[in-house]
Amino acid sequence: ALFNEWMLGMGALYIKKQLPAVATLFTTHATSIGRSIAGNNKALYAYMDGYNGDQMAGELNMEAKHSLEKQTALHVDCFTTVSDITARECKQLLDKAPDIVTPNGFEPNFVPSDKEYDKKRMAARRDLLNVAEKLLGCPISPDAFLVSTSGRYEYRNKGIDVFIEAMNRVRTSGRLQREVVAFIMVPAWVRDARADLKEVIDKNIRTTSPMQMPFVTHWLNQMEQDKVLNYISHAGFTNSATDKLKIIFVPCYLDGHDGILNKPYYDLLIGMDATVYPSYYE
């Protein structure tokens, strides 16, 4: 029986106790306390050897998660993780080195063949540019440079703040010759797809002025508290027609049924010219 991440730790421990004939495997892609250390602006990697997982769990109010994760790692038949970096973290913070490292990867057929690749890339670019034009109320060059970041909504750990700041520096550098559209594809607390944006997309209505909040494709709960939108505003982005660089927040799971782009994540990712993942915490 295979269990992934601390949330399923109770299941692993239950099977271990009640059905000892069934082998148990526990895989972690990170540690809850490591993520918390990094998310609280502490230097995780520079001082890794000095951290005590139990002590930090108490300091950061993480005892329950950390305890479950640690006990699961200690008592399953086989404990695995996905990288050498995380293996070091597990050994230091959970007091248990993984029995084996199973590196993350993709199947050989993950990237489409040449003709299929070109077809999917063109379709993705068409849809991304169409959404941008409808939201911003201005034409976007077909040759625009599309760049994105994505991942869990961990504002600092995943470098979302770094991505926005980098885009802002590029925007204000005065050196841009080519139009750039930057997408932040990070699931947030979504309320629903924007009805105004959905309508103009579905009816193929040409918009000539930016929509309200021309930075986001879906309405959020408590938008005024969203870190991404607040930093975009603080940085001075306007997404006006004269800006060489526009930034758009796509705050939903791209499962093909989000109401706006309606394509799975990987079918959109293929349309990007560059992707940026300035992650601090793996």
Predicted regions and their residues:
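Catalytic cores of nucleotide-sugar-dependent glycosyltransferases that transfer UDP/GDP/TDP-activated
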Residues: A1-E282
